[in-house]
């Protein structure tokens, strides 16, 4: 593509307040959330339409962005916009309870589902990488993964350190849109964190948004901070400027032993997401365009070195976990047979939550007023009496998390709670307690909406890790149930060929019609997660299905 239709220095921010720019709130909501994804306070590289996760985009080109906006502004309440890999391709007559937008991003026939084929199509302008919430317009900034990371660290602390992470520290890499959650999540869990990041702008972004506490230029400087904080029992974090592929092995050689090791570099994308050892940032940026194959080769070799060091920590008795960026797979493909020695975070720490349909429920205030979020926080507390763990999370979130773009909240709840919260929020809008409607969605990383054998569905009890019928059924059911927009993606989190996943978002606009849709969608969506795990034979899921009287004929009999 000549003259790069993906580059445009313009500032996009979602409208605020209760004035419509589209014809209905069900079309205003996707309009605002699309724009919010590209807010400079939200997106990692908004001028290139990149929201997070390497090259995870909100729209294919700026012309496509403009066409999507124009379509949403005129879309009828009985029409549905179809978006194919970030390009608006059709508007069709449906009905009022149908989704207003249906999105398919980055999907390839399995035999051709490789980065090589994707990059070929991407260069021709035929596709874009949607990541998970980038191309589905429900990214809320780094907050979106904070609680999941917090839950992981807390459970790891319970399993390995008797539930107390005071005086402990976590080593990780990556401070991008997802990895940037790690330092704050660690601090919330009571630990210190040393996060290695090669891009100084990313460290500065996390400092500005209060996700990391300090910045260090050298390993010695960072370790001095870690030693001082852990000795004092303080929970603080530092972003170390450098290359994880160089520094993690060096730390092991020096005899430095963290209390936990993980990684959240963008290793899922070996061309755009991972700086090779010995390369400068300038060299990397130039060669990604001039010689992408050389970049990929060097990055993959560097990832092997990185994983070898992580396995060395694991073998030395340090709890080590893969945080879902597919770095182990790359290392194995590069000849390191023991790359999967340490577990992924889902089977190690999170799966019992998924068995009950508990996952990253989130909502955003279309008014733009933080008070609307604080009021909904209070409503969540009111409707979940006795859930002290959740209440503690809400307290910490209000104190520590800075809103990026439209105010939003992440809150891990499951089947039986999501629909109650959605109905309560809708009633608050109806009564005028909130200044404008709210949108309710989730990450694609949820209990019933993803097939990802190296991440969410790793080591399933029945061996069904790679079965991707489940996210397809989830998307179909959410469409039939009346979600406001539904998305079906490929390759999020772990890269091309390694995942399929679905998303949904629904608007609470205070109307009775919205209430009916909310009750259906926010019950059915988490119920698919319980169904999926019950089918795999997990007793927790089977008990949850029975408790909620789910009708699962081929599973419960």
UniProtKB/Swiss-Prot annotation:
PROSITE patterns, sorted: UROCANASE (PS01233)
Residues annotated as the enzyme's active site: 411
EC number(s) stated in the UniProt entry for this protein: 4.2.1.49
Cofactor: binding details: Binds 1 NAD(+) per subunit.
Cofactor(s) in the UniProt record: NAD(+)
Listed InterPro entries: Urocanase, Urocanase-like, Urocanase_C, Urocanase_central_sf, Urocanase_CS, Urocanase_N, Urocanase_Rossmann-like, Urocanase_sf
Biological pathway: Amino-acid degradation; L-histidine degradation into L-glutamate; N-formimidoyl-L-glutamate from L-histidine: step 2/3
Main location: cytoplasm
Single Gene Ontology MF annotation: urocanate hydratase activity
Residues noted as binding NAD(+) in the record, renumbered to the chain: 53-54, 131, 177-179, 197, 243-244, 264-268, 274-275, 323, 493
Uppermost EC category: lyase
An example Gene Ontology CC term for this record: cytoplasm
Organism domain of life: Bacteria
Catalytic activities: 4-imidazolone-5-propanoate = trans-urocanate + H2O
Role noted for this protein: Catalyzes the conversion of urocanate to 4-imidazolone-5-propionate.
HAMAP family the record matches: HutU
Protein name: Urocanate hydratase
